[in-house]
Structures are given as C-alpha cells and as structure tokens.
Amino acid sequence: MRTARFLVCLSGACLMVALFARAEDKLTPVIAAPLVPSTQAVVGTDGKQHLVYELVITNTGTTTATLQTIEVVGADAPTKVLAKFEGAALLSRIRTAGHGPEVTVPQIEFSGTRLFLVDFTLDKDTRVPATLLHRFHLLAAGPPGSPKDQAVAQTYTIAPIEVGTEVTVLGPPLAGKGWTAFNGCCEAGGVHRGTGLSVNGQIHYAQRFAIDWLLLNADAQFFHGDEKDVKSYACYGAKVIAVADGTVVDTLSTLDNQVPGQLPDPKTITLENVDGNHVVLDIGHNKYAFYAHLQKDSLLVSKGDHVKRGQVLGLLGNTGNTSAPHLHFHLMDGTSVLGSSGLPYVIDSFEVAGQLSSEQFKASEVQGGWSKGLYPHPSSRRSEFPLDLSVINF
C-alpha cells in the first residue's frame, strides 16, 4: 500500500512531507554546529575546569528567530544542565560573522548566521561528559501549517561537540618571577578570545587561549621612565624559551620595534607583519607553539632547527601590531598563525604570585603600581592554565 502524502509550502519552497514520519525527526528552523569538532577541558589557576569553543548558528526559517536560552548538557545525562546562558550572559556571547556591527538583540534574521562564544567552568572534580549537547529555547518559524510570519516557542537539543581527554602539558615560555597574563582566557569580550578571523575560506579562533605576557619589576610596575621607550619596560629583552622539544617551522626577524604607548597606524599592518618578528615551533601531534612580537635580529634559531625544551629562541620585543613590549604566546593546530584553531594547554609547574584587578587595568592599562594584587606567599601549581591577569613565577 502506498504511503499517504500531502504537499505543504514551507519557507517559500514546497516540501513533500510523509504523514508517517519517524517520531524522532523534528523540524529545527534554527540550526547550529560547533565551529571545531572537539574541545578540551583544562584546569585554570582558579581551580576550575574551563571549556571554551564556538557554535555557528543559522536561521533557516522565514521568521526572525529570537534566542532565549542556550543550555549545555551532557549527551549521557541530558537532564543535567552544566551551563546556562540567558539575558546578558547570552547576548554578550553572540557575534556576527566577520567584522559586522555589535549585536544588540539576540535575534537572527532569515538566512542569517551568528557565532556564539561558549565558555563555562566546572568544578575540578566534576566528570566532563565525552560529548556535549546544546539545548536551545527560542522563538522561531513554526511547523507546517503555522502562520508564515509568526514565531513559535520551541525547545530542542542539537550541536554535539566531542570533549577530548588528553591534556597538552607544556613548559613555560619565559623564565623568572612576576610574569603577568594579559588578554588571557576566557571572557567572550577579551581581545584574544573574541577575535575570529575569516582566513583561507574558514573562520578561525587561533587566539582562543592566547596570552600576552608582561613583567612586573621589583616595584610592581610594568615600566619605569619614558612610556615611549621600549627599554623602560621590565619585560623588554627577556629571553623567550621553547615550551617543548620541537622543530622550527617558521620565523621572521626583520621588523623594527614599534613606538610604545599606542597601536601603530592600521594602514601599516598586514597579515604578514601583524604578529611582528616571530617563531613557530612544531612540537608534534599537530600542535604548534607560536611566539610573537620578538626583537629584530634577536632570533637564535632558523627554520628547520631542532630545539630542546628551555632553549632560548630569541628576545622579547615590540614588533608588529602592539602598543607595548610583551610576548604573545599561543598553541594552535596548524602552521598558520591566524588560519589555525587555538588549542588549550597547561603549564607543568609554576607559582601564582598574585591576581591583578581588572577594574584597575581598565582604568590605567599598564601604568602605575600593582602591588595590591600580589600575594604575600605565592602558591605552587601543577598542570594548570594561567588565567587573565594572574601573576606567575616561572
């Protein structure tokens, strides 16, 4: 006997819909998928597990969709909510694809696409599911027969992402005490975390876990003297070292220092010089360590060289798109410094010597003294990731 069918017009196109469709099938006018197929939880210096990734969300319905809540759940226990984003926490994580206008409402027009920056924490001892799912609560185009321009309340769970279990353990990229992690993980509004670039035909978040390392001097200051002199900064000229055994796969060492105090003219910045003088180190297993903004002619390695952990690669400088001397460091899954996916990692051994105030940093940037953020007794840490504005002794 032939299956009975009827013709329905949906989203401007006529679809043949079976009366006896499988019960588990569901029309989902708003679709979503992770930007990368997997993520990894790492323990930060706050003692919590951090998970950081992105979702690509597209509205396929003719009605404007409104995102109300996104919940993260485990595939093995979907009733237990691991993270919940709504209100300001939801809106602040929504981005347009590319360098579009700031998102002011949690809505997606017909055929529109948004990026959603996921970051949440779990207690250190909480078991992280092998697969995460995302439960969407939203208003969107309804099923066949619904008014064309009327949004209907809906809830469904989509967008699986795998969670790896092998943590990448690195050595420190620098030596000494008082190194401060600027622009670090994991707030969506952060300079590194919020930067997704369309490179080589795809959107990449190469700087998901990037850190800008600056050094406090004995007076808990980042610089002393003329702000426009690179030599006034405590970190300038510091030795940059290999975080693991590896092979040098790319270098640049010909660029001059920028004048500190402000970013260079954007017209002078290109994909080739944005990161200044740099080293890319292949540490195996499709993982690459990236060091940026090094001094001109300071590199002690060349492409093809094999290096050992702790070996000096070059000297910290102020080249490329930078307003003050610092070391930009991140780990990635390819040799392209912008067209790769940023990877999480932990550093095997260090001390936490303080936590600087984000309010003070916003008010004064790197000026003034920072002694109030230093601890009287640093604490030893093993296999943790330094979080934003933490002060680290290597």
Give the ranges of each region predicted by the language model.
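Intrinsically disordered, low-complexity Pro/Gly/Ser/Thr-rich segments with frequent PxxP/GP/PP motifs
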Residues: 80-127
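Acidic, glycine-rich catalytic/binding loops that coordinate metals and/or anionic ligands
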Residues: 164-182, 190-194, 224, 241, ...
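Short histidine-centered loop motifs in beta-beta connectors
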Residues: 241, 283, 287-310
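Zn2+-dependent peptidoglycan hydrolase active-site motif and core
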Residues: 247-295
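Short, solvent-exposed loop/turn segments enriched in Ser/Thr/Gly
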Residues: 35-37, 47-54
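A structural signal for short beta-strand/turn segments enriched in small hydrophobics and glycine
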Residues: 246-248, 304-316
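Short glycine/threonine/proline-enriched tight-turn/helix- or strand-capping micro-motif at secondary-structure
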Residues: 40, 50, 192-242, 251-272
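Asparagine-centered strand-capping/turn motif at beta-strand->loop junctions
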Residues: 57-64, 74
